[in-house]
Curated annotation (Swiss-Prot):
Keyword Glycoprotein: no
Pfam family name, one: Type_III_YscG
Protein name: Type 3 secretion system chaperone PscG
Function: Chaperone of the type III secretion system (T3SS), also called injectisome, which is used to inject bacterial effector proteins into eukaryotic host cells, facilitating the establishment and dissemination of infection. Along with PscE, prevents premature polymerization of the PscF/SctF needle protein within the cytoplasm. Required for type III secretion needle assembly. Also required for cytotoxicity by influencing PscF/SctF levels.
UniProt similarity note: Belongs to the YscG family.
Gene ablation phenotype (knockout): Deletion mutant looses the capacity to lyse macrophages, indicating the absence of a functional T3SS.
One GO term (biological process): protein secretion by the type III secretion system
Top-level division of the source organism's lineage: Bacteria
Assembly information from the UniProt record: Forms a stable heterotrimeric complex with PscE and PscF/SctF in the cytoplasm. Co-stabilized by PscE.
Keyword Cytoplasm among record annotations: yes
Record's subcellular location: Cytoplasm
Amino acid sequence: MDTSLIRELAELALAGSGQHCHEEALCIAEWLERLGQDEAARLIRISSLANQGRYQEALAFAHGNPWPALEPWFALCEWHLGLGAALDRRLAGLGGSSDPALADFAAGMRAQVRT
């Protein structure tokens, strides 16, 4: 399958979860899993849960998470749940990331949390 189509469908599912089209987004996540696109599928599931206010369930995906790009979602869940110590640890880890986008996220979130 064309990778650009896979990417567009994953983006559609993310947008859909933000618009409360969770069932549809999860259908796309299941399809992506069948294609071996596990990171994209996991992102959609986490986004859908977080957009429903189900932060604890979304945070459960953090255990054994092999994809650093998903860590900001877990930080947001920890913030919503008031898990300050866990959030501090996660932001410290992200701050030391070799990925500048993750390090920037950590710095920005730290600044927001302090205000």
